[in-house]
Amino acid sequence: MVLKQYNGIQYQDLGEGELILFLHGLFLDKNSTQIFFEKDSQISNFKRIYLDLPGMGDSAIIEEPSSNAIFKKLVAFIDHIIGEKSFIVYGHSYGGYLAQAIAHHYQNQVSAVFLTCPVVIADDNLRITEKHKNEFGDEMKITTNDAFFSDFEAMNVMINETSWLAYQELILPGLQKANQVFIGKLQKNSYGLSFEKELDHFGSETKIQVVLGRYDHVVGYKQQLALFVQKENADITLLSSAGHNIMIDQPGTIYSLFNKLINNKNQ
C-alpha cells in the first residue's frame, strides 16, 4: 500500500465507492483507524481515506499550532481530494471534534457522521468527565512495551490480553511518532475552534451515530448526550464497559454500529 501526500498531509486511500474519511484522536495516527476498520469486511464496498493529522503520524507540523489552522488544512485537503462528492466522516475524540466541524462546513456533502467519544468542549476545565475504572480479565504476563502498560490501564476499561495487544497495535505507533512539542502548543494555546458553538449545525439529512463510554475520564459522556439528543437524525449509544479507548474496550459493538450507519444511512 502506497502512502500518499497532499500539502503536508500523509494519507492512504483504499477501495472504490462512496467515500469514508477517517480522523484519529490526538497523539494518535492513522494506524488507530486504518488497522481497526480494515478488519471490518463490510467496508470493502466503500472508498476509505485514512490520514494523519498535522504533527501526528507521518504528517508535517504546520506553522500555527491551532485547531482553526488544522481545520483549514483539512478543508484544503477535502476540496482537492474529495471535491464536491458526497462522503461519510468518522472521528474519534479530537478527530471527532474536527469531524463535527467538517460536517458543519460541508452540510450538503456529508451524508453521515460516526463519532466515538468526541470532544464537544475544547476547554477541559469545562468538561463533565467520569471516574475511570478497570475491569480485569485473566492474569496477564507483560513481555513487550511494558513502559506503556500504565498508560494502557489509565485509558482502557477492559484489561486483558486481547485489549493489550490491540492497544499496542492501534495506539502505540501514534504515541511514538507524535510531535509532542507541536501538540503541547496546540493544547495550551489554541485547542478550541473559534466556531465551537456552531459545531452541531449539520445538514438536515445528515445521519449521526455517537458512541460514548460510561467511564470516559477524558471527554465524559453527559455533555455529548445533552447535545445530540436534540437531533432527530442522531442515534446515541452509551456503553457501560468502556472508557475513552472505546474501540479497544468494545470493538464488536463499534463495528456493528458503524456498519448499521453506513449501510442504512439512506433509509
What are these language model-derived features?
Residues 234-267:
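Catalytic active-site module of serine/aspartate enzymes centered on a nucleophile-bearing elbow/loop
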Residues 87-88, 111-114:
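Residue in the alpha/beta-hydrolase core beta-strand immediately N-terminal to the catalytic nucleophile
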Residues 49-90:
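Active-site loop/oxyanion-hole signature of alpha/beta-hydrolase fold enzymes
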Residues 91-95, 99:
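Gly/Ala-rich beta-loop-alpha elbow adjacent to hydrolase catalytic centers
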Residues 100, 104, 113-143:
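Flexible "cap/lid" loop of the alpha/beta hydrolase fold
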Residues 124-126, 144-202:
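Conserved alpha/beta-hydrolase catalytic His-Asp/Glu region
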Residues 9-60:
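Conserved HGGG/HGGXW glycine-rich cap/lid loop of the alpha/beta-hydrolase fold
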Residues 38-41, 207-242, 248:
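Conserved loop-alpha-helix segment in the C-terminal half of the alpha/beta-hydrolase fold
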